[in-house]
Amino acid sequence: MKLRNVSKNNLNKEDTKLSIEQFGGNVEWFNITKTLSESLPYIQQFSGETFIIKYGGAAMTDKKLAESFAHDVVLLKQLGINPIVVHGGGNKINEFLEKINKKSTFINGLRITDAETLEIVEMVLCGLVNKNITQLINNAGGNAIGLCGKDANLIEAKKICYTYKENQSNNVEKILDMGFVGEPHDINTDLLFFMEESDFIPVIAPVCSGENNLTYNVNADLVAGALANAMAAAKLIILTNVSGVTDSNGNLISELSVSHAENLIDNGTAHTGMIPKLQTCVRVVKEGYGSAHIIDGRIPHVLLLELFTIHGTGTMVVNSGV
């Protein structure tokens, strides 16, 4: 399907031009009306489409932000958009690991996961975090169902291994065993399409099964990206604890091409947890027809601001030059 072009840069601003004088100088009325009128082209464009939302960070741990997120998700559903929520929960996992004095090691934003850590990850993500998010959305008036990748073979994973050079002089690559860390390999889209048609909102924990009935801890960004491609989603939205993608001087980049995003990874400007996020966004816009957004989850109702206003709030990754 070809989407109409109503990007931030292509919307005709004259179509929504209003003046404060028309509202008797009432700035509040002006701002409310302006925002609502700006949203119409986006609502018309995306009605019936699927949005994959990766939820994590401060938006999850702060009660008021969590409630505003839940209300935004329900509003999307009411507008005819089909949101699918994929969540992380790293802070809560760290909290439980600290109770047993266990430290975590991360490689390129991925947690090395042994058997003991995997047990904690599955307990926290599937049994605690997932159900809390589901309840919040239901409390806001939605019909959310909590799942993990293992349910109905929703997401099949395969083991991840990293190669690295121990010594630059001999140029010999070694394999780093990440433990029970996987990446998405296959998606059961039938279940998700059924849930969309039944007006349910899937909330997915990134704990998946793989070969030989093994369980894998899969990075939530990677799961969200795989779902976006499998479901031909119009948008992938990743909530973070930063304003978006920044350049080497710390300035926010509001719109980012695939080539620019790849350069930020290669030159080290993007690092730690931003690496899998940008890699996921690049993969999605290369293989799909939608766009990917990295936005600041610390802002109340940031989903609505990014999706339904002219200027947005974070970084949009698109498959074209800027």
From Swiss-Prot:
GO MF term list: acetylglutamate kinase activity; ATP binding
Biological process, per Gene Ontology: arginine biosynthetic process via ornithine; L-arginine biosynthetic process
Residues annotated for substrate binding in this entry: 89-90, 111, 217
Any single Pfam family the record assigns to this protein: AA_kinase
UniProt key word tRNA processing: no
Recorded family membership: Belongs to the acetylglutamate kinase family. ArgB subfamily.
Native source organism of the sequence: Ehrlichia ruminantium (strain Welgevonden)
Catalysed transformations (reactions): N-acetyl-L-glutamate + ATP = N-acetyl-L-glutamyl 5-phosphate + ADP
Protein name: Acetylglutamate kinase
Associated pathway: Amino-acid biosynthesis; L-arginine biosynthesis; N(2)-acetyl-L-ornithine from L-glutamate: step 2/4
The entry's keywords: Amino-acid biosynthesis, Arginine biosynthesis, ATP-binding, Cytoplasm, Kinase, Nucleotide-binding, Transferase
UniProt EC number: 2.7.2.8
Enzyme class: transferase
Cross-referenced SUPFAM superfamilies: Carbamate kinase-like (SSF53633)
Top-level lineage group: Bacteria
Site feature Transition state stabilizer, where: 54, 277
Listed HAMAP family: ArgB
Function: Catalyzes the ATP-dependent phosphorylation of N-acetyl-L-glutamate.
UniProt keyword Transferase, yes or no: yes
Annotated Gene Ontology cellular component terms: cytoplasm
UniProt-listed InterPro entries: AceGlu_kinase-like_sf (IPR036393), AcgluKinase_fam (IPR004662), ArgB (IPR037528), Asp/Glu/Uridylate_kinase (IPR001048), NAGK-C (IPR041727)
Predominant localisation class: cytoplasm
Localisation: Cytoplasm
